[in-house]
Structures are given as C-alpha cells and as structure tokens.
C-alpha cells in the first residue's frame, strides 16, 4: 500500500496534524511525518518532495501557517498529488495561510482544504489512494456509512427530546 507523506512547517502545526495522522491510522493508511520549513530547511523540504515516489508516497500533505509556502515548495518538486493545509497563525485567522496555499501558479497545483482542515486532508489523501486500492475504498465507504449513522442517531435523539 502506498503511504502518505506528511510535512509541517513548524511543531506549532502538530495539533492539527495529529488529527490528520489519527484519521489516516483509523483507515489503516501508513504515513510518515516530518517537520521541514520551506524557509528554514529548504533543502530537506525539497528532498522530501523529490524522493516521494522512491519513498512510496502516493500523495503528500503539507501544513503551514502565516506565509505558508511549504505546500507550494513541495508541489514544485514533485508530480505526486499535494494537499495543503493552511494553519491558523497569530493574525488574520489563517486567511494569510489560506491564500498562500491556494493561490498557486498554473502548472503547480496544490489541493487545498479549509484552514486547520487536518481531517479533510487525511480523507482527501485516502480518496486519492483509494482510486487504486479497492480495500481502502471499502474502508472509506464504511466510514461514510458510520458517520451518516452517527448523524441520524443524533437526529433521532433530538426528535425524541422535541416530541416529549
């Protein structure tokens, strides 16, 4: 099975990526996670991207806040799918990171999820890998069904409360 390569610009992004890793683990998807900065450790970030295929990564997830150039720097050095997670920083409620992540030049795409969207990044990575993995696709289908059942259970409880 292909792995997901995860990289964050700073350990301050770790709480968001823990949700990513937990979601991947719940779907039995192997992953590898590193802290590499587009600005402070550009060679390591570049090498991580350049070696994505060799390291059996089916896709990459890059999370960063503020200037948030990491996902773009990763995407510039691989043709594997890259998912960007813009992280809330100290100002602008993450809008600076969102715009830095989503506004990529033509030819260097980054699929971008919501600010702090670690769970959706993991689910998108799972969907990318599931294109070539029927067992993973079945696990994703089961998760969707379980999530739907949880919502319907909450609705039933609400209806019971309102109809008393």
Question: What are the residue ranges of the model-derived segments?
Answer:
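Glycine/charged-rich beta-loop-alpha catalytic/anionic-binding loops adjacent to active sites
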Residues: 2, 29-32, 79-81, 102-110
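Glycine/small-residue-rich loop that forms an oxyanion/phosphate-binding "nest" at active or ligand-binding sites
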Residues: 77-106
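Short glycine/serine/threonine-rich phosphate/pyrophosphate-binding segments
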Residues: 13-17, 42-45, 64-73, 92-95, ...
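C-terminal binding/interaction regions
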Residues: 8-15, 19-20, 95-164
């Amino acid at each position: 099975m292909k792995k997901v390569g995860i990289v964050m610009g700073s350990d301050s992004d770790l709480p968001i990526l823990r949700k990513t890793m937990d979601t991947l683990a719940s779907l039995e998807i192997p992953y590898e996670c590193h802290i590499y900065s587009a600005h402070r450790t550009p060679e390591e970030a570049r090498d991580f991207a350049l070696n994505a295929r060799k390291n059996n990564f089916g896709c990459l997830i890059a999370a960063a806040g503020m200037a948030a150039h990491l996902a773009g720097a990763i995407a510039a050095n691989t043709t594997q799918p890259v998912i960007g997670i813009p992280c809330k920083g100290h100002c602008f409620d993450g809008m600076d990171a969102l715009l830095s992540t989503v506004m990529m030049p033509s030819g260097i795409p980054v699929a971008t999820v919501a600010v702090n969207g670690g769970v959706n990044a993991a689910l998108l990575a799972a969907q990318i890998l599931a294109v070539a993995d029927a067992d993973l696709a079945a696990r994703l289908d089961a998760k969707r069904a379980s999530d739907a059942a949880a919502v319907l259970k909450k609705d039933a409880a609400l209806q019971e409360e309102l109809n008393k």
